Amino acid sequence: MKRYNIVLFTLIVCACSVQAQTVEPITYKQYMHKVSADNLEYAAEKMNVSAAHADVIAAKVFDDPSLSFTYSNNEDHTLQMGQSYELELSQNVTLGRRTAGIKLARSQNELAEIVLDDYFRNLQADATIAYLEVMKQKQLSDIKRSAWSNMYDLAKSDSIRLASGKIMEVEAIQSRLEADIMYNEVLQAETDLKQAYMQLSLFVGTTVTDTLFHPVEELKKPEQVFVLNGLIEGAIEHRSDLLAALKNTEVARRELILAKREKRPDVEFSLGWSHNKRVRNEEAPAPAFNGVSAGIAIPLSFSSLNRGAVNAARFRARQAELQYEQMCLQVQREVMGAYQQFQSQALQVKHYEGGILKQAQDVLEGKIYSYNRGEVSLLEILNAQRTYDEVQAQYIETLFNYNAALVELERNCGIWDIKG
């Protein structure tokens, strides 16, 4: 009896170590709200959209004009040939390059927004699976604890029966050993649960030493009916990574246009004003006068004969189109695979709920009743207990796999209607 009191005390201490942290019950809706609001990686990804928006603003900037001032002295102190001042304002004009740059920046900004949507699509799916994992580990831990409790009670009963001479010592020892083995399984289940809690904290941006979020729901089988053709059509139309690939083809075309525009020569327009002072030289006197000038400068763009940059942009545009076509095929394959996996898991859950659980429980209860009456051996009890535990654990795993398959199906289809 003292041995089992120590074991029970140890379990209580383990539970208290978890409770030393703040354990906060949380619903799936609250959890997903915290993920969208507090996930640090998602917050970092949002900066890409802000940066792309800033790039659009930067692309609208015009080239700065140039203002020059020139002073000339024609040996005025010695020959009295006068002095002159000249102001010139010049402006460089790009022939369509700025407009192409603005359109490219806008397309890149739209691409960044779609990529952010795709990041959140994967984030909410991964976060949901982590939430399901905690529920699974919690229920598996409860199964292990219940099995240990049953064996613990049986071992205590065997100790009493041994003292009264109803069973042999070896049977009492074996029941104690089985209880000890199950206790180790309980400890491992508790460890797995703690690790699942830590993963959940990572998604909501809290430290594991601060708060542990405990899902209030349990694994269940939500009824969902899907039509494969509709799923494929919806995925091609709505899936964010496919939309990003399509937008990337637009970005590549914009880059090609910009590469062509950059081959155009820049034209520089200038406007000047000058003032010449009076020339007092006796041989060539001249009055003071003002002058106005206007000019245009066109560079000789021999470098535009090199078509390397344009050809590279053209190849990238074609590459983006091929990548989009390949992704369309890949999306169809992923949707079909996820649909088949979901259908398989649904059948497995239905099979378990068809009576296997109830049968395993009835067998165990019958064996325990017969054992207490001395009609069956301890080995039969252990076999029935292991069978019942395995059936329960496999059912929980199957429920988890069903829900995870549903998450993956909706992830691959680009839809999301999971409410928890």
Task: List the model feature ranges, each with a label.
Residues M1-Y28, G420:
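Bacterial Sec-dependent N-terminal signal peptides
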Residues A20-Y71, K166, V208-E250, P299, ...:
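Bacterial Sec-pathway N-terminal export signals of envelope proteins
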Residues M32, A44-V56, Y119, L123-K144, ...:
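Amphipathic alpha-helical coiled-coil segments
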Residues A43, P65-G82, N92-F120, L243, ...:
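Small/polar (Gly/Ser/Thr/Ala-rich) solvent-exposed segments
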Residues Q83-L89, L231, N290-I298:
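Hydrophobic, lipid-facing positions within transmembrane beta-strands of outer-membrane proteins
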Residues I114, N122-G234, Q345, Y388:
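Periplasmic alpha-helical coiled-coil/stalk elements that build and connect Gram-negative outer-membrane
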Residues A189, S240, T398:
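Metallo-beta-lactamase
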